[in-house]
Amino acid sequence: MSGVVRSVLWLSFFAVILLSWWMMFAMAQMMGVDWIGRPQGMMDMGGGMDGMSGTMSNTMNGTMSGEMGDMPMMQMTTFGALFPMWVIMMAAMMLPTMVPTLRSYEDLISSANGTRAGWLGVLLGYFVVWVAFAAVITGAQIALMASDIIDDLGISNSLWFAGLLFIVVGLFQFTRAKEICHGVCHSPMSYFLGHWKTGFAGGLRMGLGLGAFCVGCCWGFMALGFVGGVMSLLWMGLATLFMVIEKLPQIGHYVTKPAGFVLILAGIGTAGYGVIG
């Protein structure tokens, strides 16, 4: 019976991930954006980022149709519309990174006094923290749109801002805070052994702690969505892949700092292009 419960829980977990990705794809289609988060047809147009932003502003004054029907773009500039989008995005991008953590807890079900209720508690606590982060980054997006730093698709209007964001996230990869947070995400078993609590409530408490460290580790990759657009499925896929790799016990420590160098160089290149472009 326990094997059946385990299978149902894992299948449900992966079903939620797949559903979340499908919903993000459906929203992108509904908003009329392509796989890199630009309005359909923008890839064939020339000009710099400022010209592109102006064209998109004209596009977003109308309505765009998709498989799910027509929806005015202005609806995606309010907290009520953006917050659910970010919550779904958190599920699509961050739940896959939790697989090693849930597997570690499963080991304690067989070797210690872990329970399936505790497993669910860990999962819920982890996701609650990311839902809270979704509220924060939704507020940040609204503030950036109000300041005209990004457009209504979450795309940076300034190469300087995009370059600065790359550099800040890249530099964070070398900080002590990143090292501590990544250490917990990279070795969840150590966290469980040092903060062990039994039952659903105990799992929930540990999940909240793990979620907080995970936000501390990965917030920058979420913020990078403001470079190319928060509806960019390409960015979502690449960021998810990197965060999964970064948390793998075998190779996670080897990719953190190289990624920082790449991001810093990308930031310098982006800002430099803003000067000469």
Where are the regions that the model predicts?
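Juxtamembrane transmembrane-helix termini in multi-pass membrane transport proteins
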Residues: 82-127, 131
